[in-house]
C-alpha cells in the first residue's frame, strides 16, 4: 500500500489509453507498460454474473459498439456485443498467475459482496488486493468478508464521470480547489470512518498537507486518474504512494528531481 521509492504504478482499468478498458488485453498492455498494480471495476448483472465494467452504460462498456444498459442483460447477451468482456473470475485468474502484481478492485456494486470476497480467496489474491469504494457500508462488508484484503476509500464520489476527462471543466476545477483546501483536516477521520488503510483521492484534491497528515496516521494515499505530466509532477511533490493512470508509461518520464523528493 505504501511505496518505498517512486509511487506504485497502477494501471487504470488495465491501461485504458492503450487498449479497451477493463479487458484482459488492457491488463496485458498495462503490465507491458510497467504497471505494478492493476485496477479494474466490478459490476453485477441480472443473471448473477460479476463482470468488469465501470458503469451501467453499455456505450461505455462496449467501447462504443452499442447503446443501452448493462445490468439488465445476461452474460451471454453482453458477450454477443462485447466478446472480450471478462468476468471477475477471468480477471482474478489472470492476476493469480502473476503473483508480483497488486490487485485493485473498485466496486461498482453494493450487493453480492460475499461473492467478491469468495473469488478473492479462491484465486489466492486476497492478501495482495485493495478493495475500494465511496460506499461505506460496502467497505465495511468487505472488511468483514475478506479480512486479509486492504480497504481503500474513494474520494470524492465521481458522479459526473470526472475520471473520463483528461482536462477538468473550469467549474469542476473550482470545486476541487475548495475540497483540496479543507481535505488535510479531514483525511484521518475520513479513513477511520471507512475503516480504510488507504485513501483513493482524485489528483485535483491532493495536497502535500493532506498526504503528510495521512502518512502520520499510517494511511496510504493513492491518486487517480493521473494522465498529464503536470499532474504527475504535482503528485510527486505531494508524496503520494501510488499513481493510478490510464497509461503507466507516463511514469517513465517522471523528472529525476521529483523522484528524489519522494518520501519512503
Please state what every model-predicted region is.
Residues 85, 154, 162-264:
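C-terminal active-site rim and adjoining tail of enzyme catalytic domains
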Residues 15, 42-44, 109, 228:
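Short, glycine/acidic-enriched loop or turn micro-motifs at the edges of active sites
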Residues 27, 88-92, 113-118, 136-140, ...:
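Generic structural signal for well-ordered alpha-helices
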Residues 10, 39, 104, 244-245:
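Generic enzyme active-site microenvironment
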Residues 21-28:
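Short amphipathic alpha-helical segment that frequently serves as the phosphate-/nucleotide-binding helix
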Residues 3-7, 46-49, 54-159, 172-175, ...:
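Metal-dependent phosphodiesterase/phospholipase catalytic core, i.e.
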Residues 1-17:
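Long, acidic (Asp/Glu-rich), low-complexity accessory segments flanking structured domains
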Residues 29-44, 191-199:
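Catalytic domains of carbohydrate-active enzymes, especially glycoside hydrolases
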Amino acid at each position: 500500500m505504501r511505496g518505498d521509492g517512486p509511487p506504485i504504478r497502477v494501471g487504470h482499468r488495465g491501461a485504458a489509453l492503450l487498449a479497451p478498458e477493463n479487458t484482459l488485453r488492457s491488463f496485458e498492455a498495462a503490465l507491458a507498460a510497467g504497471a505494478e498494480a492493476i485496477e479494474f471495476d466490478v459490476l453485477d448483472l441480472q443473471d448473477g454474473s460479476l463482470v468488469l465494467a465501470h458503469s451501467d452504460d453499455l456505450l461505455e462498456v462496449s467501447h462504443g459498439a452499442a447503446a443501452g444498459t448493462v445490468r439488465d442483460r445476461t452474460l451471454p447477451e453482453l458477450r454477443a456485443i462485447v466478446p472480450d468482456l471478462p468476468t471477475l473470475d477471468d480477471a482474478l485468474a489472470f492476476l493469480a498467475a502473476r503473483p508480483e502484481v497488486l490487485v485493485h478492485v473498485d466496486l461498482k456494486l453494493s450487493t453480492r459482496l460475499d461473492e467478491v470476497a469468495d473469488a478473492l480467496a479462491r484465486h489466492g489474491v486476497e492478501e495482495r488486493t485493495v478493495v475500494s469504494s465511496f460506499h461505506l457500508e460496502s467497505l465495511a462488508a468487505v472488511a468483514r468478508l475478506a479480512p486479509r484484503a486492504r480497504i481503500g476509500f474513494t474520494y470524492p464520489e465521481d458522479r459526473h464521470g470526472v475520471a473520463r476527462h483528461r482536462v477538468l471543466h473550469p467549474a469542476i476545477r473550482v470545486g476541487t480547489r475548495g475540497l483540496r483546501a479543507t481535505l488535510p483536516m479531514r483525511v484521518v477521520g475520513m479513513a477511520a470512518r471507512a475503516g480504510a488503510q488507504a485513501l483513493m483521492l482524485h489528483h485535483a484534491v491532493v495536497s502535500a498537507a493532506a498526504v503528510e497528515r495521512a502518512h502520520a496516521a499510517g494511511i496510504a494515499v493513492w491518486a487517480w486518474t493521473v494522465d498529464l505530466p503536470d499532474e504527475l509532477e504535482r503528485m510527486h511533490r505531494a508524496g503520494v504512494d501510488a499513481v493510478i493512470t490510464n497509461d503507466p508509461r507516463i511514469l517513465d518520464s517522471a523528472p529525476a528531481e521529483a523522484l528524489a523528493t519522494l518520501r519512503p
